[in-house]
Structure formats: structure tokens, C-alpha cells
């Protein structure tokens, strides 16, 4: 089977609009966006659209790892595939980051971008620093440091992350309202056919599960133990059906080998083809995930969600936990006392909302491009949410 992990589409049930790179001749400047991980694709799709509406040329590169390529193809992005996942282990990761940075340099020399933009792409940060291209680095996990002694020109993060956790001066630290997922979740439109596509009955209580990211630098083996304990806890409830979203084919094979009886009796299933992750979350009764993006997507959709992530808890997840939108599970006992495995009352569609996060991020990028810093190192420019400058 050609396994693909489900994706987070913005408008399920319809073909995404093709997003082209703007031509080289440009009125307002050129922005280079690097897609380093799968969640970055749906995040940047509306940003690219907004930048192109403002007549900015956008060049897109992507790393061939996890589901980045599949997602970029789904959204019909015009991108150049550069580099791949380097595997587990600190030395291999560092070597892989540096090697991909070198692979990105020809794109910089050819395209001559005015600004390098990413969501935590360390390879892009290294390459742009070496080529003296100013960088706009977005991040929502304060414990993921950019690089030792290499910092972006501007760093933008959700406003719930405290200023004191960031390495740069206040004039270089920008912020936006809400969380990263608020950039694209407000555009989501539900497609009710998802349950029948997965062979689920309307009366089934559905839990969507996302295993921990074993290859991530922040991975804690306790997350794996908690995931297995959660499956054992849930499989004892006859009304529950478990939909699992593995991160890759290797993880899918491990799941089938670990719980063959649950797959054979239909208790647990992996989607056979690409499905819309947001749509699956919306039509689930609750979510249990070791991945931050799926947790926050569920929180944005007001779907009950339980986190089995056992790394350092960042400010965004702490904020969601304090506001009752995310439940943090610390041990197997929490499975018994905190999870409420029942049907939820699901409205016909999510609550409508305007993405203040999207407009804030785009306006800051535009202010950066309009300033003299990007192309000639000129004076500071004041923006509505702060000052962009040296």
C-alpha cells in the first residue's frame, strides 16, 4: 500500500486553487518561503495568497520529509524540492541541517530574494545568514532554539509566548494574536462524507489519535508509553472506534504489528488514502495526540483534545490548558480520570471567525518589505503592532 498520512486541507470537498510563484519581474519585491515540515504547508498557503494579492513575488522551496511533498502537491503549490530528512541522532541532524543549508544556496543566488521566511526552518536560517539575506523566522515553541549564535533578523511568535524566553532584543521580536493554527483554521469548511469514507457509522464514538514524533529532537519516550496505554484503555470500550494518523509508513507498519487484532476486528483503522485532517478532527468526538499541531487544530475547532506530549510544555499549550481548550495527560492514571470518551454535540459547522493572526503576520511581513532594511538597510518603520527595525 502506498501510505500517506492525512492532511490539513483548508476547504474539503473542493479542489484547492492553484498557487503559482509570481514571475521574476516584480513590483514590490521577492519573498522566499521554505517549507521544512508538514504543518508549515497549510499554514503558509493563505499567507502566500495574501502576499501575492499585494503584488509580491513568492518563491517556495520544500524539504522532502514526512508529508511536505504530498501537502504541497495537494495545494498545487509551485515549489522546488530541496533536501530530505536526515534521520535520528544529534550528529546526523546537525549534519543534515548544514548540508541542506548548502543545497539551498544556489536557489538564493539564482532568485535573489529580499526576505527569507519560514516557520522554524534552521537550514533556511543558516543559508540566508551566509548569503546575507534578511530573515523572518516564525515559531510557536520557545524551546526550539533557532541555532547556536545564529539568529534571524526578525522573530515572530504568538503573543502568549513571554518576551523573556526569546533571545533577541524587543525591536526584533514581533508577535501576533492567537495561535499558529488560527491562520488557516477559520477557512475550514466541513465535509460530512468523511465518516462513510472511513467505514464509520453515525452512531460510532470516534477518537482520532496521532502517535508521538519519534524522530523529532524534542521526543520523550514517555510519550510512546502513554500512547500505548491510551490505546489499551480505549479499546476496552465497545462503542469506540479509533482512527490513527501515523506520521509515515514505518509508523503505520508498527501500529499494525503492535495491535493486529484491533485492525482485524475494525476497532482501529488507518485511512487508506489521503483525507483532510481538519475534517477528520471536526467529525471526531475527541482527539488524543502526541503532536502539537493536531492538538492545537482540535483546540481551534473546539473539539475535546488530550495531549500525550511529554516534552517541555510550551507557552501555547500552557495557555490552551489554562483556558480549558486542551487537557494535558501526564501518566496512565490520567487516562482513567481525565478522558471523557463520549459523543460530543457537534454543530453543523465551526463558529465563523476572521483570522486576526493571518492579517497580523502578513502586515508585519509587508512592513518589513516596505522598510529600507530589507534591500538597503535603511531607517526603522513603525507598524501597528510594534517597530520593525534595527
What is each residue range found by the language model?
Residues 114, 119-182:
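Conserved nucleotide-diphosphate donor binding/catalytic pocket of glycan-assembly enzymes
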Residues 100-104, 249-290:
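Donor nucleotide-activated moiety binding/catalytic core segment of transferases
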Residues 10, 19, 156-223:
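A nucleotide-sugar donor-handling region in carbohydrate enzymes
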Amino acid at each position: 500500500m502506498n501510505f500517506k498520512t492525512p492532511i490539513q486541507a483548508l476547504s474539503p470537498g473542493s479542489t484547492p486553487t492553484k498557487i503559482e510563484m509570481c514571475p521574476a519581474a516584480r513590483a514590490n519585491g521577492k519573498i522566499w518561503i521554505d517549507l521544512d515540515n508538514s504543518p508549515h504547508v497549510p499554514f503558509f498557503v493563505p499567507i502566500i495568497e495574501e502576499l501575492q494579492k499585494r503584488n509580491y513575488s513568492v518563491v517556495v522551496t520544500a524539504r522532502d520529509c514526512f508529508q511536505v511533498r504530498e501537502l504541497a502537491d495537494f495545494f498545487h503549490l509551485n515549489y522546488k524540492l530541496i533536501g530530505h530528512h536526515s534521520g535520528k541522532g544529534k550528529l546526523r541532524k546537525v549534519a543534515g541541517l548544514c548540508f541542506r543549508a548548502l543545497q539551498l544556496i544556489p536557489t538564493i543566488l539564482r532568485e535573489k530574494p529580499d526576505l527569507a521566511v519560514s516557520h522554524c526552518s534552521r537550514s533556511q536560517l543558516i543559508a540566508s545568514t551566509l548569503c546575507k539575506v534578511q530573515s523572518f523566522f516564525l515559531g510557536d515553541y520557545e524551546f526550539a532554539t533557532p541555532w547556536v549564535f545564529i539568529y534571524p533578523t526578525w522573530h515572530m511568535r504568538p503573543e502568549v509566548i513571554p518576551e523573556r524566553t526569546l533571545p533577541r532584543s524587543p525591536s526584533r521580536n514581533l508577535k501576533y494574536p492567537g495561535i499558529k493554527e488560527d491562520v488557516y483554521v477559520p477557512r475550514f469548511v466541513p465535509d460530512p462524507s468523511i465518516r462513510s469514507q472511513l467505514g464509520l457509522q453515525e452512531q460510532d464514538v470516534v477518537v482520532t489519535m496521532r502517535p508521538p514524533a519519534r524522530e523529532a529532537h524534542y521526543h520523550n519516550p514517555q510519550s510512546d508509553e502513554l500512547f500505548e496505554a491510551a490505546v489499551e484503555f480505549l479499546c476496552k470500550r465497545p462503542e469506540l472506534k479509533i482512527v490513527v494518523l501515523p506520521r509515515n509508513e514505518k509508523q503505520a507498519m508498527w501500529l499494525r504489528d503492535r495491535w493486529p487484532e484491533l485492525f482485524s476486528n475494525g476497532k482501529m483503522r488507518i485511512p487508506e488514502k489521503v483525507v483532510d485532517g481538519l475534517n477528520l478532527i471536526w467529525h471526531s468526538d475527541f482527539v488524543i495526540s502526541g503532536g502539537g499541531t493536531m492538538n492545537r487544530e482540535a483546540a481551534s475547532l473546539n473539539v475535546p483534545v488530550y495531549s500525550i506530549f511529554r516534552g517541555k510544555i510550551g507557552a501555547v499549550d500552557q495557555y490552551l490548558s489554562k483556558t480549558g481548550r486542551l487537557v494535558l495527560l501526564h501518566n496512565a492514571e490520567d487516562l482513567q480520570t481525565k478522558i471523557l470518551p463520549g459523543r460530543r454535540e457537534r454543530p453543523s459547522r465551526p463558529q465563523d471567525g476572521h483570522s486576526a493572526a493571518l492579517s497580523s503576520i502578513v502586515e508585519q511581513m509587508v512592513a518589513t518589505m516596505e522598510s529600507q532594511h530589507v534591500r538597503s538597510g535603511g531607517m526603522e518603520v513603525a507598524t501597528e503592532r510594534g517597530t520593525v527595525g534595527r
